[in-house]
Amino acid sequence: HKPYGYLSQFIYELKRKKKLLGELYNFPKGTMAIGRLDEDSEGLLLLTTDGMMSEVVRSKKVDKEYYVQVDGIINQEAIEQLQKGVEIGFNGTKYSTKRCKAFLIHEIPAFGARGKKIRDERHGPTSWASITVNEGKFRQVRKMTAAVGFPTLRLVRVRIGNVRLNDLQAGEVKEVENFQIEI
């Protein structure tokens, strides 16, 4: 479970001090992340020492589900826009996202407090939605919620294919034998 504030990599060559995955656990030599979660995102991050497995998962259209806390109370109209696809900026051009699954989450997920406070409650209400995509453009889910008027405050990946985060706590690592992902 990648915590907030960590890069989803093991080596960082710029001068600024960043928190890296290798600080969480004594991973085997050659461990790499399958895909990425940005520094501000949390949740399920698959790691492997098998470069072929990494490539298979990244090259296939595997569903990735995110629980997203947004600014304001997201409405059904915004959910339907997300489902149909929205226009976002990508590599300096406009990009229309593919259709996705999206729905409002009525109960607040039990992820525990984030290391850094999201914001003061005096700034108004927030709500949670589930968004499942099978593509992965740079900061795509954040851009999608902003495009429908509900900026992302917290983003937690809860599923990749058939692999779920379940009750794994931030910073915890679970080793999986004979790993296979359903596509």
Model-derived features with residue positions:
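RNA pseudouridine synthases
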Residues: 1-183
